[in-house]
Amino acid sequence: MIPNNTKFSNPLFGRILTAMVTPFKKNGAVDYELAIKLSNYLCENGSDGIVLCGTTGESPTLTWAEQHNLFVAVKGSLNSRSKVIVGTGSNCTSEAIEATQKAYEFGADGALVVVPYYNKPPQEGLYKHFSSIANAASDLPLMLYNIPGRTGCNLLPTTVNKLMNFPNILSIKAASGRIEEVTELRAACGSKLSIYSGDDSLLLPMLSVGAVGVVSVASHIVGLQLKTMIESFQKGEISIALDIHEKLQPLFKALFETTNPIPIKAALELRGWQVGSPRNPLTPLIKEKRESLLQIIQNLSL
């Protein structure tokens, strides 16, 4: 069921969505039991919902069967208590359509659909790609995902505005690293599009120009702090929000010192969550960066 509109005051997916890591056992298999425990912990500690099988979840190295089993495990545990959004994007339109349709069939609350990567389609190709997905899964709320640093392709606000004709395209994860992206999207699309920051470090600045929340990596370990920051901003307690924003900057920076999700997996292990190493070709965090990350975590009294 697609709502008639999405309100700035009450976004469909909530304010804080954790882009959850995929836990692996020592033998490299997905640890579904730990994924259930982690997702429940996150939703009890600040997160309004979980994004599975995104960048942080190492979707490029998960089989479709693993992605399906991961969703079934997590959604079955959380049930209706929290939103579960599934990454269904691909640089092959037919593959993305199939994945998005299956996400709907198995009860996902929404799908995160990334801009096609590597083949770098023009804007008309991006429009056709996303419109085809929206038509094929018309009852599933969709969140577009613009991350040109990874895809090599930028989804322009004018193209997003054209896509707003599809009632199930309700939101976008803006991860270009540019605060101006929010302003440009709001100028093109108005308030009918819910814009989520795709960068923890830019959450507060993006809130100030119209974003509704964040698809977060740091919320694995500072979800409650992020929740307080957003609530303080909403109440006009800007000095409190700014204080949290500034205190968390060293952590935000450390979590992206190297390729995500390498640092956040290390941070979780330092907090006692044995989520395993990333799958090849990603590698574990090197010793020096791990020690630096530990110091930051200790300084924050986490």
Swiss-Prot record:
Its EC number is 4.3.3.7. Pyruvate binds at residues 56, 215. The active site is at residues 145, 173. This is 4-hydroxy-tetrahydrodipicolinate synthase. Catalyzes the condensation of (S)-aspartate-beta-semialdehyde [(S)-ASA] and pyruvate to 4-hydroxy-tetrahydrodipicolinate (HTPA). It comes from Prochlorococcus marinus subsp. pastoris (strain CCMP1986 / NIES-2087 / MED4). PROSITE patterns: DHDPS_1, DHDPS_2. GO terms for biological process: diaminopimelate biosynthetic process; lysine biosynthetic process via diaminopimelate. Pathway: Amino-acid biosynthesis; L-lysine biosynthesis via DAP pathway; (S)-tetrahydrodipicolinate from L-aspartate: step 3/4. Homotetramer; dimer of dimers. Keywords: Amino-acid biosynthesis, Cytoplasm, Diaminopimelate biosynthesis, Lyase, Lysine biosynthesis, Schiff base. Signal peptide: none annotated. It holds the Pfam family DHDPS. One of its GO terms (molecular function) is 4-hydroxy-tetrahydrodipicolinate synthase activity. It catalyses: L-aspartate 4-semialdehyde + pyruvate = (2S,4S)-4-hydroxy-2,3,4,5-tetrahydrodipicolinate + H2O + H(+). SUPFAM superfamilies: Aldolase. Belongs to the DapA family. One of its GO terms (cellular component) is cytosol. The gene is dapA. InterPro entries: Aldolase_TIM, DapA, DapA-like, Schiff_base-form_aldolases_AS, Schiff_base-form_aldolases_CS. It is found in: Cytoplasm. The record marks 55, 118 as: Part of a proton relay during catalysis.
